[in-house]
From Swiss-Prot:
Its main location: cytoplasm. Homodimer. Homodimerization may be required to stabilize the binding of ScpA to the Smc head domains. Component of a cohesin-like complex composed of ScpA, ScpB and the Smc homodimer, in which ScpA and ScpB bind to the head domain of Smc. The presence of the three proteins is required for the association of the complex with DNA. Disulfide bonds: none annotated. It comes from Streptococcus pyogenes serotype M1. Belongs to the ScpB family. Keywords: Cell cycle, Cell division, Chromosome partition, Cytoplasm. It is found in: Cytoplasm. NCBIfam families: SMC-Scp complex subunit ScpB. GO terms for cellular component: cytoplasm. One of its GO terms (biological process) is chromosome separation. InterPro entries: ScpB_csome_segregation, WH-like_DNA-bd_sf, WH_DNA-bd_sf. This is Segregation and condensation protein B.
Amino acid sequence: MTYLSQIEALLFVAGEEGLSLRHLASMLSLTPTALQQQLEKLSQKYEKDQHSSLCLIETANTYRLVTKEGFAELLRAYAKTPMNQSLSRASLEVLSIVAYKQPITRIEIDDIRGVNSSGALSKLLAFDLIREAGKKDVVGRPHLYATTDYFLDYMGINHLDELIEVSAVEPADEEIALFRTQD
């Protein structure tokens, strides 16, 4: 693995919150100067690559992967996709986690799912099923997410306490079989 690929992977997983220079340097065991050189290489790679939609930005010593400006119109159109499209499995997973664990941060959602949830969160925000509900009082002050009144309408319920209790949902026999161990 190259430093560039490791930086790219870390920034991808960090999503919109990005990572500080100090945190990246620590993760990669690089000096800040050596890391800045690698970040510059990555930035130049994205600038030169016309087949990539990504670019690297830095704000207040925090680095993020974002889409290039030329994709703004396409992404705006995507964000306005009508709600009659079904939600992806990832979006449904994230929506369920937010509904049952709210208020919750993206990192906490990622920890539960084991994968990055930025895309699903963005889609759910665009569909007004979830909202930002403040910031958690921890280092980095990450956004907290909660469901909206539209979520209640969408689910056909009046209050969150009408959600099915998680313990009431029984896994299918096939799912149980996956977790059985053979002695």
